[in-house]
Design a protein with these regions (language model features):
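Alpha-helical structural motif
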Residues: 69, 208-212, 237, 241, ...
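Glycine-rich, charged/polar anion/phosphate-binding loops
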Residues: 11-13, 236-241, 275
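Extended, charge-rich low-complexity interaction segments
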Residues: 135-159, 227-234, 239, 306-325
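A charged, amphipathic alpha-helical module
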Residues: 221-266
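Short amphipathic C-terminal alpha-helix that caps PH/PH-like domains
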Residues: 212-220, 271-272, 276
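N-terminal export/assembly segments and adjacent metallocofactor-ligating motifs
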Residues: 1-218, 257-258
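Acidic catalytic cores of enzymes that act on phosphate-bearing nucleotides/polynucleotides
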Residues: 264-325
Length: 325
């Protein structure tokens, strides 16, 4: 539980910036300045320590009282025929307020991260998925397959907290865990085990990921693949990976939608999610979509909870009108 020491330090602080629920930070607050003392990383420190400079509302570049700024915005919304509310880098209460404002002003509401979010949302809406939680990963994973993502760049403490943790709830041998990258090569050594075991890397360009994932799924299903290579990867290497997935007791396929920045990436997400379902016919496997930085998941969940639809929804007709395209 978060608490403050006599020296003005805040202990066991949760990070709203990292996307993996780090809850062990020590921070110091001095006026408008926040400093991460312990357990920070590049993402968390940037979030907490970015200087707060502009704290006064402005209209046309001039500082004005808050009441005047609110009145100005209200008039703009009232006079607009097609207002848009965007950004949404906020918390739950901020997202609720933005949804209420969109409804009242008949605006379109969207998140700055919608392009990435829809790579997951469209799959969830179409065929569904089987996904797990960070706690389940920490306690159960024995094979982690990272698809098309350099997760240690965007989630620097993922391996420290979720994979190479000191112990698991079920007395698993942590060192026996396997990490495999498919697509992108990791930018650092976070995926290396405490005793020096390197991650296996099966590299290919993003453009080939849809084809590579399709072949991997076919191999998991026991289909015959006549090709010798796909996307520069030997099919025998993918066959070995398919067998590893089938032999694992609790594999986790992890991806970050923001990293899958190519046309129709949602079809690749769908393929890997369907592969997870295939694996569950004989063993246990789950997906893990990473995200949540800067309020993107919060905004989508609040929108779905309050309107029945995710972001990119229009209220101009007096009711929610969802159009992801």
């Amino acid at each position: 539980m978060t608490e403050m020491t006599d020296s003005g330090m805040w202990l066991e602080v949760s990070s709203p910036f990292c996307g993996i629920a780090s809850d062990d930070l020590t921070i110091k607050v001095d006026g408008n300045t926040v400093t991460v003392i312990d357990n920070g990383d590049a993402v968390t420190k940037k979030g907490f320590e970015t200087p707060i400079t502009e704290i006064s509302p402005r209209v046309n570049g001039k500082a004005v009282p808050l009441e005047q700024a609110v009145t100005h915005i209200a008039n703009l919304l009232r006079e607009s025929k097609q207002p848009a509310i965007a950004g949404m880098a906020t918390d739950l209460n901020g997202a609720r307020s933005a949804m209420a404002l969109a409804d009242k002003s008949r605006a379109t509401i969207d998140s700055m991260d919608s392009n990435a979010s829809f790579r997951n949302t469209l799959v969830l809406q179409d065929t569904g998925w089987m996904v797990t939680t960070l706690t389940e990963v920490r306690n159960r994973v024995d094979l982690l397959l990272v698809v098309g993502s350099d997760i240690e760049r965007d989630y620097p403490r993922f391996y420290e907290r979720m994979v190479w943790n000191k112990e698991s709830m079920f007395d698993q041998d942590i060192e026996s865990r396997q990490v495999v990258y498919l697509g992108k090569t990791p930018s650092g050594d976070a995926s290396t085990s405490p005793q020096g075991k390197k991650a296996q890397v099966i590299a290919c360009d993003d453009a080939y990921l849809p084809e590579v994932m399709s072949v991997l799924r076919a191999l998991v299903k026991g289909k015959t693949v006549q090709a010798k290579q796909v996307g520069g990867i030997a099919v025998t290497a993918l066959a070995t990976l398919a067998e590893q997935l089938k032999q694992a007791k609790y594999s986790v396929v992890v991806w970050a939608a923001s990293s899958l920045n190519f046309e129709h990436a949602e079809t690749t997400v769908q393929t890997l999610c369907e592969m997870v379902k295939d694996l569950n016919l004989t063993t246990r496997s789950n997906g893990l979509p990473l995200g949540g930085k800067e309020g993107s998941i919060t905004a989508n969940y609040v929108a779905a909870w309050q309107s029945g639809f995710p972001m990119r929804t229009n209220f101009n007709r007096g009711y929610p009108d969802y159009d992801p395209y």
